[in-house]
Every structure is written in structure tokens, then in C-alpha cells.
A protein has these predicted regions:
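Conserved oxyanion/phosphate-binding beta-strand-loop segments in alpha/beta enzyme cores
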Residues: 1-12
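Glycine-rich N-terminal segment of FAD-binding domains in flavoprotein oxidoreductases
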Residues: 16-107
């Protein structure tokens, strides 16, 4: 699971660099990793916070001394229907990725 173990804590900055927190950071590769992270959090009595692309000015993803799940690697556009303007993406997709995909279709 993940690239950092539970014993590793790391200082994370919000994208706007106005706030920071020390978190146990995990980079899940699949849904099974997510289940394992939730089981770990439940066993330890700690909370889980999520970060998508990590480019929000807010600091909602910071989860001080708790688990931070970094989903920036989950950055695929799964489906795009230009006729209806509906797009399905993973949580790490950026606005720039969305624009590159939809603007050429007139959206």
C-alpha cells in the first residue's frame, strides 16, 4: 500500500501556501489500497482527509496528525460526451486537463 508507511509523517502545504499541517500521507494505487487505508484509520481511531489534484487555494485537504490520501495520481478522464457536455473524471484531474479536453469541442 502507498509510498509512505503509517510511521512516516510529512509536512504538507496547502496549494496557496498559506497553511500547513503534518500528516500521514498515502498514495493509493487502487480501490483496495483505499479500503486498507480506511481499515487502518478505524483501527487507529484517526480520520482520513483527501486531496485530489492539490491545486485548490483552500486548505480543506490538510488533516493535521491524521491520514491524508493524495489522489493526484488518479488523473484520468474516463469519459467525455461532447453532445451532452458530460464528463467523468478521476479525483486528481486538473482544470487544465478538463479545458484541454472540452474547449476543442466548443464547451
Amino acid at each position: 500500500m502507498g509510498k509512505l508507511s503509517y510511521q512516516s509523517i510529512r509536512r504538507e502545504m496547502a496549494w496557496g501556501m498559506a497553511s500547513e499541517a503534518c500528516c500521514y500521507v498515502y498514495y493509493p494505487e487502487d480501490e483496495n489500497d483505499l479500503l486498507e487505508i480506511f481499515e487502518l484509520a478505524k483501527a487507529r481511531g484517526i480520520t482520513v482527509g483527501f486531496r485530489g489534484a492539490g491545486q485548490s487555494y483552500g486548505d480543506a485537504s490538510l488533516n493535521g496528525e491524521q491520514i491524508l490520501v493524495d489522489l493526484s495520481g488518479w488523473n484520468r478522464i474516463l469519459d467525455w460526451d461532447p453532445e451532452n457536455g458530460l464528463i467523468t473524471v478521476q479525483s486528481g484531474v486538473t482544470i487544465a486537463q478538463l479545458w484541454r479536453r472540452v474547449v476543442s469541442s466548443g464547451w
